[in-house]
Amino acid sequence: METTQTLRFKTKALAVLSKCYDHAQTHLKGGVLQVNLLSVNYGGPRLAAVANAGTAGLISFEVSPDAVAEWQNHQSPEEAPAAVSFRNLAYGRTCVLGKELFGSAVEQASLQFYKRPQGGSRPEFVKLTMEYDDKVSKSHHTCALMPYMPPASDRLRNEQMIGQVLLMPKTASSLQKWARQQGSGGVKVTLNPDLYVTTYTSGEACLTLDYKPLSVGPYEAFTGPVAKAQDVGAVEAHVVCSVAADSLAAALSLCRIPAVSVPILRFYRSGIIAVVAGLLTSAGDLPLDLSVILFNHASEEAAASTASEPEDKSPRVQPLGTGLQQRPRHTVSPSPSPPPPPRTPTWESPARPETPSPAIPSHSSNTALERPLAVQLARKRTSSEARQKQKHPKKVKQAFNPLI
């Protein structure tokens, strides 16, 4: 095997970012670790954790060159690749390389890229070596490199930025909650420099956020740490963008780290929005560039809206007489009148003599009325005698005894 590049990190600089990495670990776990070799001309190589954010978003958790202690390139500049990438989740989905690399117990960490002698000029494998602070434990992680992926941080290098808007934590939280309610649909974002507002629209739902304008241009704003988090912006032109709602919610959540950073929205003329983590002054000088690129979601939203529109199956109204054909005169003949319906014979049944109802004898009715009355009197008499016995109990008569 031939070694192509060697990279050794400052473990203390990586340990400072352990809180930030844990905040974004849920999204970064399924992504890749990438070493940007193009940035050697801009200060040194950069290590980045790259992953997807929702439907149309790309996360870049990039470490500045200040965290690199030593860099050696054993290839010529023409043979060296622009970037090398390998999976963050390795060893049967049981070991997360990024979590181990940004851990606080690591004493030394290095990356070694190498290739087979007959494999060409591009590196094929990577070996991650870590030594821990107990001076005994040591781990090696070896895996194959992934196919070439362009550096995530260079995607917006040639884009023209026309506005930046900083959101305070309370405003970012309300916007994140609103974006989560919209699901994975498209959100139309309008930046208005005349009214100093940003409007977010998804279907019938709409949210308007205002900001305080700054007197500087977009490239001069927010170049250093943020001293005070407030809703301010530097905008020079009107722009309309379309992003995915779930990607917007994920970007706001990732870039809003408590006591570390607040989200900054960067608008580009091509319709792309980049949500960047603006580091606070209280967080200190962290070697971190965290950003989420929100790509244009207009085409996907239009396709979804076209597919969701129901087809109009109701018949169209046509002008009177359309589709009727006039019959020629020589074929028109008067239609015969329908024959009258046959008369049915009617007959009347003879009236039947009414039969008088049998008369009820008078003695039977009197007897039927007298029986219930007698029963009622007997019941009253019995009840009255019972009450008399209860009121006047029977006295026991004593017989005369002559012997007394």
UniProtKB/Swiss-Prot annotation:
Changing S337A: Complete loss of phosphorylation. Changing S349A: Complete loss of phosphorylation. Residues 335-344 have a biased composition (Pro residues). Residues 302-404 are annotated as: Disordered. It holds the Pfam family Herpes_DNAp_acc. Residues 1-300 are annotated as: Homodimerization. This is DNA polymerase processivity factor BMRF1. It comes from Epstein-Barr virus (strain B95-8) (HHV-4).
